[in-house]
Regions:
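N-terminal ligand-binding/catalytic initiation module
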Residues: 1-113
Length: 113
């Protein structure tokens, strides 16, 4: 399936441009936008208000250093991430991720789903 609505297709194109190299995030946004097509067709005011553009852009994203000492007494340094998409209806969902394989695209994917 692909995005047929012109407005949603433009939003998706912008997401890809603004978030290059984040295929997991692109996939999550594509799936959500495809599911929203009937809603957007019935509610053109959502486009006028830029609703979807606001949904797909995180309110904030934090990356931070986590230093810890392993069992051998050696200090390890990892990067932690937190992404927050939308607080309009209450607290943010999501959590913190510290695994070395995690990067911003994965965090956005997890936070957006």
């Amino acid at each position: 399936m692909s995005i047929k609505n012109a407005y949603l297709a433009r939003v998706m194109e912008d997401v890809v441009k603004r978030n290059p190299g984040e295929p997991e995030f692109h996939q999550a946004v594509t799936e959500v936008l495809e599911s929203l097509e009937p809603v957007i067709e019935k509610n053109p005011e959502f486009e006028e208000k830029g609703l979807i553009e606001r949904i797909v852009e995180p309110e904030r994203m934090v990356s931070f250093r986590v230093s810890w000492t392993d069992d051998n007494g050696k200090v390890q340094v990892n990067r932690g991430f937190r992404v927050q998409f939308n607080s309009a209806i209450g607290p943010y969902k999501g959590g913190l991720r510290f695994h070395p394989s995690v990067y911003s695209g994965i965090i956005k994917f997890l936070g957006f789903e």
